[in-house]
A protein has these predicted regions:
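Acidic donor-binding loop of glycosyltransferase active sites
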Residues: 262-273, 287-288
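Conserved donor-binding/catalytic core segment of Leloir-type glycosyltransferases
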Residues: 188-224, 230
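A charged, aromatic-enriched C-terminal amphipathic alpha-helix characteristic of glycosyltransferases
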Residues: 328-362
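A short, active-site helix/loop in glycosyltransferases that binds the activated sugar's phosphate group
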Residues: 114-115, 145-187, 231
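Membrane-proximal helix-turn-helix segments that form the acceptor-binding/catalytic region
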Residues: 62-70, 91-102, 128-167
C-alpha cells in the first residue's frame, strides 16, 4: 500500500511513515521543518519571505502535484498541510482527493472543530480556551477563537474537508472527542507513534537532587501554560534549592532539545490539554511526565492498569503540591519511570500504531464499497 502524508507536527507523521515502511509499505511525508525545530520530512516545501517566496512556494507545489497521484491514502494535517489561503488550499485538497483512492483529515493541533468543541460545546475540564466554566481571555485564546470560529473562509474549508474526507482521525483525547462530537460515524482514534530507545541508564533510584526539565516555545507560552508552570517551578526551586535542579530549554532544535532533556527525572510539559509528543518523548527516555493525564485519555487507549503520568491541575497551588511531593520523596520516581517506558512501548510504539493505522483501510473499504 502507498501512503502520503501532507503536513506534520512534532515528527508524528514522519514516525508513523517509518513504521509503515518497516511493515512493507510505501510512505512519503511532505511538509516543513518547523523553522528552528528542524523536524524531519521526506520532501521539504517551505514558504520563503515576500512575494517571491510565495511564488516559488506555489511553483514547487504545482511541480509536485503530478507525482502525488495514485496513493491508497492521502492524510492531511488539518488545515496546516499547506501555507496558502483557504481558497487555494481547497483547490489542492480537491485535486488530491480526486486523484487518489482515499483521503483522511487528521487533527494534530488547532482546528475549527477542536475550537468549537472547547468554546461552544465545553467538552473538557480545561483546554486552550477554558478553565472549568471560565473562558480564557488571554490574547492567544481570543485570537484563535476568532480565527477558527468567525473567519468565513477558514470555517468553510474546515467543513468541506471534514465532510468530504473519507475518515477523520484524532491523535489525542481532546482532538478525538471534538471530532467524534460532530462526526461520530467517521471519526477514528489513532495514537501518536513513538520510537522507544534502549533501556535508559537513569532508571532506578534517583541519586541526588531531582532534575526537573521544562521546554518552552516562547510564542506558545500562554497557549501551553508554560508561563504559569515556569513560575511554579521557580518558586519550588527557591524553596528547595538543595533538593532539585531546574533545567529550561527555550526554542531549541529537536535533537538538541532531546539531548538537554536526557537524564532528567521529571518533565513538566503543558497545563491545559492532554499529553502529546513532548510527554511521550520524555516517557520513552524513562522520564516521568507531569502534564494533563485525565482518566478519559487512558480509557481511550483501553488502559486500565498503568497510569504513570503526574496529572497537573489547572491551578498554581495544586501544581506546586504535586511536584513538591516528588521533590521531597524522590524514591517514588523509580516505579513511575519504569511504568512510563512500559506505557509508551505498550500504547504508542510506532510499529503498533502503524498497524492500527493500516487497519483504517478496512473501515474505508466498508464505508466506500
Amino acid at each position: 500500500m502507498k501512503f502520503l502524508f501532507i503536513g506534520d507536527a512534532s515528527n508524528a507523521r514522519y514516525t508513523l511513515a517509518k513504521g509503515l515502511r518497516e511493515l512493507g509499505h510505501e510512505a512519503l511525508v511532505i511538509g516543513t521543518r518547523g523553522k528552528w525545530r528542524r523536524m524531519n520530512v521526506d520532501i521539504c516545501v517551505e514558504r520563503g519571505a515576500g512575494r517571491v517566496g510565495a511564488v516559488v512556494y506555489l511553483l514547487r507545489w504545482l511541480l509536485l502535484l503530478p507525482k502525488l497521484r495514485g496513493y491508497d491514502i492521502v492524510d492531511f494535517n488539518g488545515q496546516f498541510f499547506m501555507d496558502f489561503k483557504p481558497g487555494l488550499k481547497r483547490l489542492f485538497f480537491d485535486y488530491l482527493r480526486k486523484h487518489n483512492r482515499y483521503v483522511i483529515s487528521t487533527l494534530l493541533g488547532l482546528g475549527h472543530y477542536y475550537v468549537k468543541g472547547c468554546v461552544e460545546a465545553k467538552l473538557f475540564r480545561s483546554s486552550d480556551f477554558n478553565i472549568g466554566d471560565t473562558p480564557r481571555t488571554n490574547a492567544f485564546a481570543s485570537q484563535m477563537a476568532d480565527e477558527w470560529l468567525n473567519q468565513p473562509e477558514v470555517v468553510k474549508l474546515s467543513r468541506h474537508m471534514a465532510e468530504t474526507s473519507h475518515l477523520l482521525v484524532g491523535t489525542g483525547y481532546e482532538y478525538w472527542a471534538c471530532l467524534h462530537h460532530y462526526f461520530p460515524e467517521k471519526t477514528c482514534f489513532v495514537p501518536l507513534p513513538m520510537e522507544t530507545p534502549e533501556e535508559p541508564a537513569n532508571i532506578g533510584e534517583t541519586q541526588g537532587p531531582v532534575r526537573i526539565f521544562i521546554g518552552i516555545q516562547k510564542e506558545r507560552d500562554e497557549e501551553k501554560g508554560t508561563d504559569i508552570l515556569w513560575r511554579v517551578l521557580q518558586r519550588l526551586n527557591n524553596d528547595y534549592p538543595d533538593k532539585m535542579t531546574l533545567v529550561r530549554a527555550e526554542n531549541v532544535p529537536y535533537d538538541e532539545y532531546c539531548r538537554m532533556m536526557a537524564g532528567s527525572d521529571i518533565l513538566v510539559d503543558q497545563l491545559y490539554t492532554c499529553y502529546a509528543m513532548n510527554a511521550l518523548i520524555a516517557m520513552s527516555m524513562g522520564i516521568v511526565a507531569a502534564t494533563v493525564a485525565i482518566p478519559e485519555a487512558y480509557a481511550l487507549l483501553s488502559e486500565k492498569e498503568s497510569f504513570p503520568m503526574i496529572d497537573l491541575p489547572p491551578d498554581e497551588e495544586g501544581i506546586y503540591r504535586q511536584l513538591e511531593h516528588y521533590v521531597l520523596h524522590p524514591e517514588r520516581l523509580a516505579e513511575a519511570k519504569r511504568q512510563s517506558i512500559a506505557f509508551v512501548r505498550k500504547r504508542h510504539h510506532y510499529l503498533e500504531v502503524a498497524r492500527q493505522y493500516m487497519s483504517l483501510m478496512g473501515r474505508l473499504e466498508k464505508n466506500n464499497p
